[in-house]
Amino acid sequence: MTRKYLMIAAGGTGGHMFPAQALAEAMLRKGWRVRLSTDARGARYTGGFPHTTEISQVSSATFARGGILAKAMVAPRIAAGIAATAWEMRRDRPDVVVGFGGYPSIPALGAATLLRLPRMIHEQNGVLGRVNQLFARRVACVACGVWPTDLPEGAQGVHVGNPVRAAVLERAGAAYIPPGPYPMSILVMGGSQGARILSDVVPGAIAALPEELRQYIRVAHQARDEDGARVTEFYAAHGIDAEVQPFFHDVPRRMSEAQLVISRAGASSVADISVIGRPSILIPFAAATGDHQTANARALTGANAAILIPERALDSAALAEQIAAVLTHPDAALQMANAALSTGAPDATERLVGLVEQLAEKETP
């Protein structure tokens, strides 16, 4: 009996790739054949995918980077990617195509639309990304990570939550150790690509904490390559025990051991925080399309599980005050951790799997 075949299309950031990885893990366990279609940027994140996942790098591009010449080449490169993917799909037909957003998902979704293959998209944020907005009315359904999600007229939305990787599910609801007079961990995440503003502000905020509190703090700080040296030097100069890396491959473990998470409000980060259950201070990316990171944070802040600081209000003094507020009130910190758990959707992957299986049995749209 021929195995069913799922093609997953996802862009080159952790926000798109981590939920795609979660679906790949689940469908492989169910005996499906799984292929990931992405570009060179996305290929950097494939190390976490199960080794049985087939990987295809496609021709794609984005209007967000490069000069006039680079932008002029975007449409031809995407068109070439669609043509090549359509040719491949005619020879090797997927039962379902699922897009997770980002420009590299255009070739697979575009080809599936041309060939009228069963297809759907997953939107991680409370506001549709540009690519998902393009396809929202051209797919069987939009699986939504945040609810409500602003959808165009005619799009069929279904709330599933944001799938998290198996390594996160293994630590779902991990026991929380409230802050106290013993070593305490702070995890600083700027999304999969780091965030300069966190590298500018967080070290100074931790240095500004009273010595009787600061002496117990251990920091794991994700910083961009170009910021790593100065951030490391700052922590060392102020006697702060810190590990600084451009990317942590063991975020679930570090998060489960943390007393506090300081993070952007990307969909995957918020999902991990909710499923593991940790107090957090969230700084939404101000330039995010449709201010979607503020929308992502709404469930956590509404449950009093997170403190939200807009970028315009962020400085070391303000952040230090909020860090101290969490780490000097253990009972309140424990309440925040429990409240975070109440917003999580650890069954999001199962819900998404159900939609994929239903779509595989339906008539081609």
UniProtKB/Swiss-Prot annotation:
Q: State any GO CC term.
A: plasma membrane
Mind telling me what this protein is named?
Answer: UDP-N-acetylglucosamine--N-acetylmuramyl-(pentapeptide) pyrophosphoryl-undecaprenol N-acetylglucosamine transferase
Q: What is its EC number?
A: 2.4.1.227
What InterPro entries does the record point to? GlcNAc_MurG, Glyco_trans_28_C, GlycoTrans_28_N
Q: Where in the cell is it found?
A: Cell inner membrane
Residues recorded as binding UDP-N-acetyl-alpha-D-glucosamine, renumbered to this chain, are 13-15, 125, 165, 192, 293
Q: Which family does it belong to?
A: Belongs to the glycosyltransferase 28 family. MurG subfamily.
Gene encoding this polypeptide?
Answer: murG
Q: Name one Pfam family in it.
A: Glyco_tran_28_C
Recorded GO molecular functions are: UDP-N-acetyl-D-glucosamine:N-acetylmuramoyl-L-alanyl-D-glutamyl-meso-2,6-diaminopimelyl-D-alanyl-D-alanine-diphosphoundecaprenol 4-beta-N-acetylglucosaminlytransferase activity; undecaprenyldiphospho-muramoylpentapeptide beta-N-acetylglucosaminyltransferase activity
User: What function does the entry list?
Assistant: Cell wall formation. Catalyzes the transfer of a GlcNAc subunit on undecaprenyl-pyrophosphoryl-MurNAc-pentapeptide (lipid intermediate I) to form undecaprenyl-pyrophosphoryl-MurNAc-(pentapeptide)GlcNAc (lipid intermediate II).
Annotated GO biological processes are: carbohydrate metabolic process; cell division; cell wall organization; lipid glycosylation; peptidoglycan biosynthetic process; regulation of cell shape
Keywords tagged on the record: Cell cycle, Cell division, Cell inner membrane, Cell membrane, Cell shape, Cell wall biogenesis/degradation, Glycosyltransferase, Membrane, Peptidoglycan synthesis, Transferase
Q: Which HAMAP family match?
A: MurG
SUPFAM superfamilies hit by this protein? UDP-Glycosyltransferase/glycogen phosphorylase
> Cell division: present as a keyword of the record?
yes
Q: Note the topology in the membrane.
A: Peripheral membrane protein
Q: What is its main location?
A: membrane
